């Protein structure tokens, strides 16, 4: 089939929808993107927030881009502005509250007898000397041999351990055991975190709270419900990978919309390499109410002697005329939005496929919320190098991350795996009081349906599960067919979108 004649609708202009459409357009196709709102980026978008009488360009902030995320890096290298972000080796503080009294003020090393007894301050980074040795071990080999990879892996783990500061030896020993265990004992998808870690007999409360915090922030799931397989994937990518920059964190000086969503939408208008590198065809404020499918024979479109294929139309809110027909539909929505759309579309010719998709979507865990409290901090300005992220751990209650915003006096306090907005705000108030985080002004951004929890026994639907109906799935809750078990994240969203784009493109050849 002539690629110019292939009609593709991408529903949703989040990171998944935009990246899928961009890759399709790069391949010479002409997708149309339909977005219900006026703003692109989905749940990873920019926001204009007023703090202290000044408007700051921030974002909804709940997504962390941590680890060797090849798909993000590939797209960012092609479309992003390198001045907007850098990848750096992790370097963050851990403050572990041991009691009920006030802890030290954020960003200040206040040392009183009360503070020393109630809050343990630590630091976790990678030793640069061992990172240099790791680079030598890998050499310039794109595919290093088994011995080189084993040596590089050992050096990577040692770099973490040597870079740790003020962490008790017992806790450090258990962290080392955890890293080895994650690499050598991959669990099943049906295995719970607590069952998987039971043989380690972890005793130190710091390690226990750190694991719980990792489940909350990376898997958006309470530890008792968390999937061991996806936790092990996070541990292996972040702390037990032979790749030199596997654990590097992205530090951006712009909001998430400016980082990648808008560049994907706008393309590379200055590029001479690709004829299709211009802006995507975006239909904003176009809510798709219903999918309408009719099976037609290819001869109706110029072919002969072939089985009927689905042709799709879209019913758009506020429009009497249907959009279409389309040869392919890419659903790049949240599970809840996709389910509502599919249930409204069950009367079409492909009802069996849609009913199966609706059943699969209804089986996914309900999303939990994430609170990001953007604060204008009341403290002496520090350079970006001096302002480290902080992991705030308590003996009871939710953990939180405090992320300083590059180039400003703002910081985001992030609480994940939350079930209620009011309770999340109360937890944030307690954490601020407990750790002495003083702000001049703040603004709470609560994403009620932030990400699908990575509960044990849950498998992500495959991106091509419904390819026979020319219906494709893209999103952070979709499997990309690689066999890697990532939690719901921006990277998993991009990987599923890439898989969709490649599959549709391959079908044209």
PLM segments and residue spans:
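Conserved flavin/dinucleotide-binding core of flavoenzymes
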Residues: 48, 106, 121, 127-128, ...
